[in-house]
Amino acid sequence: MKKLVCGLTLCLSVGNIFAGSTKDIYKKNWIDFNKNGVKDVYEDPAAPIEARVADLLSQMTLEEKTCQMATLYGSGRVLKDAWPTAEWSKEIWKDGIGNIDEQANGLGKFGSELSYPYANSVKNRHEIQRWFVEQTRLGIPVDFTNEGIRGLCHNRATMFPAQCGQGATWNKKLIREIAKVTADEAKALGYTNIYAPILDIAQDPRWGRVVESYGEDPYLAGELGKQMILGLQAEGLAATPKHFAVYSIPVGGRDGGTRTDPHVAPREMKTLYLEPFRKGIQEAGALGVMSSYNDYDGEPVSGSYHFLTEILRQQWGFKGYVVSDSEAVEFLHTKHRITPTEEEMAAQVVNAGLNIRTNFTPPQDFILPLRRAISEGKISLYTLDQRVGEILRVKFMLGLFDNPYPGDDRHPETVVHNAAHQEVSMKAALESIVLLKNENQMLPLSKSLNKIAVIGPNAEEVKELTCRYGPAHAPIKTVYQGIKEYLPNAEVSYAKGCNIIDKYFPESELYNVPLDTQEQAMINEAVELAKVSDIAILVLGGNEKTVREEFSRTSLDLCGRQQQLLEAVYATGKPVVLVMVDGRAATINWANKYVPAIVHAWFPGEFMGNAIAKVLFGDYNPGGRLAVTFPKSVGQVPFAFPFKPGSDSKGRVRVDGVLYPFGYGLSYTTFEYSALKISKPVIGPQENMTLSCIVKNTGKRAGDEVVQLYIRDDFSLSLIHISEPTRLQLIS
């Protein structure tokens, strides 16, 4: 409490210092940003945006222009002060800054001190914005950026399933709802630009960031990503999809360092890896793009004129600004090692088309080499004006020069994490769950069960069962808690059984290591609990220690002692249900052969326990469909949809086929398709056709069905995929 009071006192005192010289800039219907007493064109809300951009550029110095081309990381990471201070007039951002990332969102040095109650966070951003508007010469507002791939990356914001789970819903309308919730909460808290969605396609399940992807198919990822972009920007925010481009297929799935060396041919790059971004820009009008760390064919993407100008701007008509992933610019000099000096590094990225550099280091580390590169003639003033103009255009489009203080500093709690938003979170958790196996209709379980054993390292886990770039400190309901609350009259007991990983992981994946005394005791406890129970529900999978950025794997089997736990509990002879809570595909061949019922829940978010309980006991009929292929062996990888002829052919000495295919998912009911109609039997290159059919629920339960349409060419000028999805529709 003392820290918060001190911070607020500092805020007020700073505000009083500034107020005397700036109180007259706020006019009726306009703001005198440059404090000259005249309504300049860039200050006129009625003037065309291009005219406002040109007028502002004409008034800017070299120092002011270059300051727009860098990010200032907030929350004590680079910006060490919680509130503006008099010392800021000596910092490089005295001439402005392009954007401030993750300020007062609950991460970093200040934690929840500034982020919650929510009004503190809004007031903090308003005071920082006020400093830039009132204390810099031209008063150019800051773009406050934040992450948001599974809900807004803010303390106690509404949490949704990880993007891999959102992909499993196959529900475009739901993604639009998630986008609106994220946007509404961002707006209420004063953020203006959300770094979402991730449009990387997950073609290699070993890769650590598959958890953050909508799936392996470019059509599905593009359609869902388009809805996220449209939903965010419909509420007045900028959406910045990432990571452009060809980022998600590093050789061997190895994630770390620069994520270099994607072995992707040009045609595959365009049809698979660029297609979701093309949709996001051409069809949804994304105002931002984040450039990636990796190279393509030896050229770093963040320094590539081909990617950032020829493809983005010339081919696709991109009108926003490109921000680098953190340290992607510096990698040209330090890791890719293609620019001998920092000045050449700055010149290459700016000439290529990059607008804003981001890194966890002070902005002057880029701005000063940038200025030297300009003075040395490595960057023309024309190019500089292009890059800065693109940044300013987005700021005008966001309305920052008309209202630089968005957000509700009085009652943001009426918006953030409200009841309606929690309903959308619950809906998303339910729709993301995929039923993988249901032998003899073992599921749904009877609600009259007396003794239920909930076993496994993910049964009572909270902290590690999310992924990055989303809400923190949300009240997550565990699977054990969810089942216990769902059946208050049953005896529901819990045993951990083992940890997600053992102490020798990942080396233990290379050879058998005997169980130590503690590990054996944990498994024994779980076995004894199963023996005295009517059923054992095992909750296994992964967590942030096994799947996330920089956490790639060389195996897709269950980690640690989980397989031994599963087999030991199964050996008791009691009925077993397996619930997988994980962020990637797993080679659960043994479970698929022996365990009668398997459910995959991904990382469902704050209503994890409630949603899984509803599915297991029949209050909700699971309708999720896999957005990634489950291989039988890691040796089959890469093994992802869409396939080319021959890539899934049979062999004599290798494992063939998939464990679960892309688009797969069972239901508690059955559906019948009939009366397929095609409007035209033959169409030309630029013509359309309409297909329709009748889908009938032939079972005894209500349920959802994802109608999937796949097409292929009989003959084509080049080798193409056997079939590709072209439409999807969720019906209930």
PLM features: residue spans?
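Bacterial Sec-dependent N-terminal signal peptides
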Residues: 1-20
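Glycoside hydrolase catalytic-domain context in secreted enzymes
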Residues: 16-723, 727
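Cationic, low-complexity basic patches in intrinsically disordered or flexible, solvent-exposed regions
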Residues: 730
